[in-house]
Amino acid sequence: MKIVFSTKNVSRATFLDTCCYAFDYGFEGFEIYDAIKERSTHHDSILRQYRISDAKRKLLNRNLAVSALRMPDSLESGNTTADLVEKYVDMAASSGIANIIVRIDKEVSFDVLEEKISGAVKKAEQAEISILFETMGYLADTEKVIGIINHFSSAAIGAS
């Protein structure tokens, strides 16, 4: 996928409107920022179990794809729990979205990372979903990203 945008600062009334926006401006797709909010805001969201096939048709008809689900809070945040990360993996898997993007804003111990994402990594491996660490801020240092990838030793972990 070449050109995509994040829905973080894009406000559209429906999932279809977001698809039309992407198509009209020549994007090849978009990443969904804050999947929980997306699912509750858009009645026609690809993240709603009973709307997946309809939403996929909206994407397919415009030659678009959802490239990733992006978590709004960093992993070290109190708002990000192990259950939430696993929920993102489940939503991505059921919706046919290949990637989840997470971030770390400051140094955190591997114990905290294990607590927050080890269950999600196992689920992601089984569902062939990639958990990608955003390489900016604290993780702009390539060695730090490689350290995380090596720590988990999983094909489900990568960098964005």
What spans do the regions from the language model cover?
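N-terminal pre-domain/capping segments
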Residues: M1-A98, S154
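Acidic/histidine-rich catalytic cores of soluble enzymes
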Residues: E115, G119-S160
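A generic short-segment signal for beta-strand/edge and adjacent turn/coil regions
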Residues: A35-E38, T81, I100-V102, L113-E114, ...
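Active-site groove signature of glycoside hydrolases
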Residues: A92-D111, A127, L132-M136
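Short, small-residue-enriched loops and turns at beta-alpha junctions
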Residues: E38, D73-G78, K106-F110, G137-D141
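Structural detector of well-ordered beta-strand residues that form the stable sheet scaffold
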Residues: V4, S67, I101, L132, ...
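Active-site-adjacent beta->alpha loops and helix N-cap segments on the catalytic face
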Residues: R39-T41, I46-S53, V108-S118, T142-E143
